[in-house]
């Protein structure tokens, strides 16, 4: 089984860290391939970045479908950019890290908080929660003003900031689990879970395991209505 993890931004450093973490959690024999577009924003930190990145993400999926299709796709950005569009392009399972993590939290806790990056993404995070049908379980959204690459620039300081925000979510907001709201936070879930005493869900790990399960069960993306292949038309 091969899962293609696509980091929609153009940061190869982030792609490498995502690939390493993903390979550690999947079953023996599952291969993680990880790529990022060569063009587009270096990081995705808002709607404008996401709009630019989505086009190049779709190009990567189209190339993979032509040249070397995987068994499943994972979109490794917590905004789940282009998720529905990619589901239209392929029959294979496509998993967004946000949808996977939000749903995963429901199996281990009655409530969850998302600890993410910048205040500007709050509206989009609420929309992701609504789309997942999880609004009634959301305790809070914590946005401690961390950039996507904060953990690559000053890991210790970023981790302390993340830990404090998650601690507040548990102690003050009633969160019984924490969803890490950025692929750049990969690799810290277990440490935080041990310190906080609640499940902390890494979205990349969750998405890869969900994708793996979908392939193992033989499930494909339905083409009944919503995710039908795009109709043929002229593109200028």
Swiss-Prot record:
Enzyme class: isomerase
Temperature-activity note from the record: Optimum temperature is 55 degrees Celsius.
EC number(s) per entry: 5.1.99.5
Keyword Zinc recorded: no
Site (Seems to be responsible for recognition and proton retrieval of D-isomers): 77
Activity regulation annotation text: Completely inhibited by HgCl(2) and iodoacetamide. Stimulated by dithiothreitol.
Alphabetical keyword list: Amino-acid biosynthesis, Coiled coil, Isomerase
pH dependence: Optimum pH is 8.5.
GO molecular function terms listed in the Swiss-Prot or TrEMBL record: amino-acid racemase activity; hydantoin racemase activity
Reaction(s) catalysed by this chain's protein: a D-5-monosubstituted hydantoin = a L-5-monosubstituted hydantoin; D-5-benzylhydantoin = L-5-benzylhydantoin
Site (Seems to be responsible for L-isomers recognition and racemization): 182
Gene Ontology biological process terms, A to Z: amino acid biosynthetic process
PANTHER family linked: PROTEIN DCG1
Function: Involved in the asymmetric conversion of racemic 5-substituted hydantoins to the corresponding L-amino acids. Catalyzes the racemization via enolization of D- and L-5-monosubstituted hydantoins. It shows preference for hydantoins with arylalkyl side chains such as 5-benzylhydantoin (BH) and, to a lesser extent, 5-(3-indolylmethylene)hydantoin (IMH).
Family: Belongs to the HyuE racemase family.
Subunit description: Homohexamer, homoheptamer or homooctamer.
Protein name per UniProt: Hydantoin racemase
Organism of this sequence: Paenarthrobacter aurescens (Arthrobacter aurescens)
Upper lineage: Bacteria, Bacillati, Actinomycetota, Actinomycetes, Micrococcales
